[in-house]
């Protein structure tokens, strides 16, 4: 059975090497996020200050996969 992942929205706070980012979730948690393969293939640029959707495992809530970059109009704010 496939593991269920939790999907959160957050804000990119810092860019790290190799496509990794610090993401502050809406519930104020800090998560280390990496870019999914689809975003890498599409060469979508992610910068600090961008809002993203991130998929977090139930077992390790400190790491997650960035699956979508939100446009300004898509965000809740």
UniProtKB/Swiss-Prot annotation:
Residue ranges of coiled coil: none
UniProt KW RNA-binding keyword: yes
Residue ranges crossing the lipid bilayer per the database entry: none
Main location: plastid
Superkingdom as given in the UniProt entry: Eukaryota
SMART domains noted in UniProt: S1
Molecular function in Gene Ontology: ribosome binding; rRNA binding; translation initiation factor activity
Keyword Plastid in record: yes
Keywords of the record: Chloroplast, Initiation factor, Plastid, Protein biosynthesis, RNA-binding, rRNA-binding
Domain S1-like positions: 1-71
Gene Ontology CC annotations of this record: chloroplast; cytosol
Localization (cell): Plastid, Chloroplast
Subunit structure: Component of the 30S ribosomal translation pre-initiation complex which assembles on the 30S ribosome in the order IF-2 and IF-3, IF-1 and N-formylmethionyl-tRNA(fMet); mRNA recruitment can occur at any time during PIC assembly.
Role description: One of the essential components for the initiation of protein synthesis. Stabilizes the binding of IF-2 and IF-3 on the 30S subunit to which N-formylmethionyl-tRNA(fMet) subsequently binds. Helps modulate mRNA selection, yielding the 30S pre-initiation complex (PIC). Upon addition of the 50S ribosomal subunit IF-1, IF-2 and IF-3 are released leaving the mature 70S translation initiation complex.
Protein family: Belongs to the IF-1 family.
Name of the protein in question: Translation initiation factor IF-1, chloroplastic
Organism: Acorus calamus var. americanus (American sweet flag)
Gene for this chain: infA
């Amino acid at each position: 059975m496939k593991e269920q992942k939790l999907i959160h929205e957050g804000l990119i706070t810092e860019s790290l090497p190799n496509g990794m980012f610090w993401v502050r979730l809406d519930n104020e948690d800090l998560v280390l996020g990496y870019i999914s393969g689809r975003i890498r293939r599409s060469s979508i640029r992610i910068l600090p200050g961008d809002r993203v959707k991130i998929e977090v495992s139930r077992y390790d809530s400190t790491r997650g996969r960035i699956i979508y970059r939100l446009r300004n109009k898509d965000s809740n704010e």
